[in-house]
């Protein structure tokens, strides 16, 4: 009985002395949250010096979809494309991070953007998919957005005819 009591006491003492440490995965996830937050906020505020400090030398930005501007861009090409995008807006674009979902190799940011396009209100929703290397640098961002809203509000093109309900189909 004394041995069992001693063993329980010893286990209790040892377990009280141990501190709970974060797993390597949890540390990487928190690091990635910080990196993508800094990266997006610098892009959103136009601080491209900070933005550039968060990306790798072989960084690419891919705009998915069927737009004439859809494709993959280097950092320098992204700067030109961002300037062209801003020219379609009356007072610039501001994005808001709605959610960040991170893993050990990257993150996803769910965004909502607000702007006044040349053809009216342009409030689009976005997904930015980030890949992050071992050095903690963003190697790629892949952006998903509504092509239809983009061409209607920024290019002034009507995409489809009269809006129909399910009952009308």
Model-derived regions: residue spans:
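Short, low-complexity N-terminal intrinsically disordered segments enriched in polar/charged residues
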Residues: 16-53, 159-169
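Hydrophobic pocket/interface hotspot
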Residues: 39, 50-52, 59, 78, ...
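Sec-dependent N-terminal signal peptides
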Residues: 4-13
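Hydrophobic/aromatic beta-strand elements that line small-molecule binding cavities or substrate pockets
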Residues: 95-101, 113-114, 125-132
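Short, cysteine-centered beta-strand-loop-beta hairpins and adjacent loop/turn segments enriched
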Residues: 88, 115-123
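A solvent-exposed, acidic/Ser-Thr-rich amphipathic alpha-helical stretch
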Residues: 53-103
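Low-complexity, intrinsically disordered terminal/linker segments enriched in charged
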Residues: 140-169
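A short, polar/proline- and glycine-enriched secondary-structure boundary/capping micro-motif
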Residues: 72, 119-122, 149-155
């Amino acid at each position: 009985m004394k041995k069992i009591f001693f063993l329980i006491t010893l286990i209790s003492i040892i377990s009280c002395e141990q501190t709970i440490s974060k797993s390597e995965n949890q540390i990487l996830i928190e690091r990635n949250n910080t990196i993508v937050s800094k990266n997006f906020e610098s892009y959103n505020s136009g601080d491209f010096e900070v933005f550039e400090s968060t990306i790798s030398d072989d960084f690419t930005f891919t705009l998915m979809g069927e737009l004439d501007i859809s494709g993959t861009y280097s950092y320098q090409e992204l700067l030109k494309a961002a300037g062209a995008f801003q020219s379609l807006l009356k007072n610039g674009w501001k994005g808001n991070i709605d959610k960040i979902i991170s893993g050990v190799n990257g993150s996803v940011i769910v965004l909502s953007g607000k702007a006044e396009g040349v053809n009216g209100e342009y409030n689009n929703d976005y997904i930015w998919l980030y890949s992050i290397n071992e050095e903690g640098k963003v190697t790629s961002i892949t952006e998903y957005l509504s092509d239809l809203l983009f061409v209607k509000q920024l290019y002034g093109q009507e995409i489809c005819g009269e809006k129909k309900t399910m009952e009308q189909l």
